[in-house]
C-alpha cells in the first residue's frame, strides 16, 4: 500500500519522513561502487542510528529548479488539461526502507495514479536538446 506523506518538500517534516530511507534520487548511487556509495550508506546509517538529519547539497541549478517548479506544474496543467496534486514523499509497504519524492501526482480518467517529475534544464542544456532534436529520457 502506498502512503503519501504530505509535508512540503524541503520542510523539517519531509526531511524527518525521509530519514534512513533509500530514495529514488539516490538509488543510482546505492547501486554504484566506490566512495560515493560508501558515503551514502554511512549517511543512511547515521540517520537510522542517531536521527542525524542531512539536508544535503543544493546547487544554484537545483535551487532554480525548485523555484520554477510551481510555474512548471501550472504550465503542465495548462498544456495537458490534467490536474496535478502536490505531494511530499511516497512510501510503499511492499518496499520497506524506500521512498520517492514526486513533484506531483496525476489521477487518470481510468482511476490510476501517475507520478510527475519536473525538470527545469538550464538554457544551454535545453538548446542542446533542441539542436539534437531529442527529448531527454
Q: In which residue ranges do the predicted regions lie?
A:
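Charged, glycine-rich intrinsically disordered N-terminal tails and low-complexity linkers that flank
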Residues: 1-67
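Mg2+/Mn2+-dependent nuclease catalytic core
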Residues: 55, 60-63, 67-137
Amino acid at each position: 500500500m502506498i502512503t503519501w506523506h504530505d509535508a512540503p518538500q524541503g520542510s523539517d517534516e519531509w526531511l524527518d519522513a525521509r530519514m534512513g530511507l533509500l530514495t529514488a534520487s539516490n538509488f543510482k548511487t546505492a547501486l554504484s561502487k566506490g566512495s560515493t556509495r560508501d558515503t551514502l550508506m554511512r549517511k543512511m546509517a547515521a540517520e537510522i542510528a542517531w536521527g542525524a538529519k542531512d539536508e544535503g547539497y543544493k546547487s544554484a541549478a537545483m535551487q532554480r529548479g525548485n523555484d520554477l517548479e510551481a510555474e512548471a506544474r501550472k504550465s503542465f496543467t495548462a498544456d495537458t488539461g490534467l490536474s496535478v496534486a502536490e505531494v511530499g514523499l511516497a512510501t510503499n509497504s511492499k518496499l520497506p526502507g524506500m521512498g520517492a519524492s514526486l513533484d506531483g501526482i496525476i489521477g487518470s480518467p481510468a482511476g490510476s495514479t501517475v507520478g510527475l517529475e519536473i525538470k527545469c534544464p538550464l538554457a544551454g542544456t535545453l538548446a542542446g536538446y533542441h539542436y539534437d532534436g531529442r527529448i531527454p529520457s
